Design a protein with these regions (language model features):
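A conserved glycine-rich beta-strand in the N-terminal activation segment of trypsin-fold
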Residues: 1-16, 38-41, 75, 130-131, ...
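Gly/Ser-rich catalytic serine loop of serine hydrolases
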Residues: 3-4, 73-79, 118-136, 205-215
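Catalytic-histidine neighborhood of serine endopeptidases
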Residues: 10-54, 58-61, 70
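Active-site-proximal beta-strands of protease catalytic cores
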Residues: 15-20, 81-93, 130-151, 159, ...
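Gly/Ser-enriched beta-turn/beta-hairpin loop segments
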Residues: 49-51, 62-68, 104-119, 171-178, ...
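Flexible, gly/ser-rich surface segments that form the specificity/activation loops bordering the active-site cleft
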Residues: 74-114, 149-152, 169-172
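C-terminal cap/linker of serine protease catalytic domains
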Residues: 140-196
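PDZ/PDZ-like groove recognition
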Residues: 171-226, 230-233
């Protein structure tokens, strides 16, 4: 298969590239096609099954001078300051370049152990295509991934906040495992706590079978109020 890739880092010897797990984890061989159509072999660094993102690397010794001169390291923007009505550009894996406006930044995607902010746009998009969302400064603000996207009734592009994904990306880039608990949860705010007479904290909506949370006895409906005697806020 094929998916979008973003060059995160150039450490002098390798290019570190962010891509999708579903197009690399079962591949016998990995290759990257750069902007000038040059192809080079790549190696897996690490992936996260929960979010579906992966980090791969390409040895710069495999690239010619023209390719090195044509590529650039992406700058990750702050998706927390993206507002409704902002102009954005979508780059999809099929080389399509699409423009549009942000229509919402208030939606969330619930995943195991975390909730991720979603940027919704008015850009028409094929849900089978992955891509990246950038602002008018050329900064990456969101990722549109095949296996990690909210189910929308319309066919407009949605992207998961790059700021929310950054902690996962940093761990994968260093080759570290992403901690895994195995719960789908939501925050119990003070307003919700007062309305339903439950404590503030993290409300567990679902526990994955045989996960660390399941083994420890956590159940759907529980509210986590503290971890290691530290209050959850």
């Amino acid at each position: 298969g094929q998916g979008v890739g973003v060059i995160l880092r150039d450490n002098g010897k390798q290019l570190i590239i962010l891509t999708e797990k579903n197009v690399v984890d079962k591949a016998d061989k990995l290759s990257v096609t750069f902007v000038n159509d040059m192809m080079a072999d790549a190696a897996m660094v690490k992936y996260d099954s929960n979010t579906g993102i992966a980090i791969i690397s390409v040895d710069k010794s495999l690239l010619d001078d023209a390719t090195i001169g044509a590529i650039a390291v992406a700058e990750l923007g702050n998706s927390n300051i993206v507002s409704r009505g902002a102009s954005v550009i979508a780059l999809e894996a099929n080389y399509a370049i699409l423009t549009g406006l942000v229509t919402s930044t208030t939606n969330e995607l619930s995943a195991q152990d975390n909730n991720y902010s979603v940027i919704t746009t008015d850009i028409a998009s094929n849900k089978l295509q992955s891509g990246i969302l950038i602002n008018t400064d050329g900064q990456v603000i969101g990722l549109s991934l095949q296996d990690f996207n909210p189910a929308e009734e319309n066919n407009t592009l949605t992207a998961v906040s790059i700021s929310d994904l950054s902690p996962v990306i940093e761990k994968l880039e260093s080759g570290a495992d992403v901690p895994y608990i195995g719960i789908t949860c939501t925050t119990v705010t003070e307003k919700i706590a007062n309305r339903y007479n439950i404590p503030k904290g993290v409300y567990i909506k679902q526990v994955t079978m045989d996960s660390p949370a399941f083994v420890s006895g956590l159940q759907s409906g529980d509210v986590i109020v503290a971890v290691n005697n530290t209050e959850v806020s």
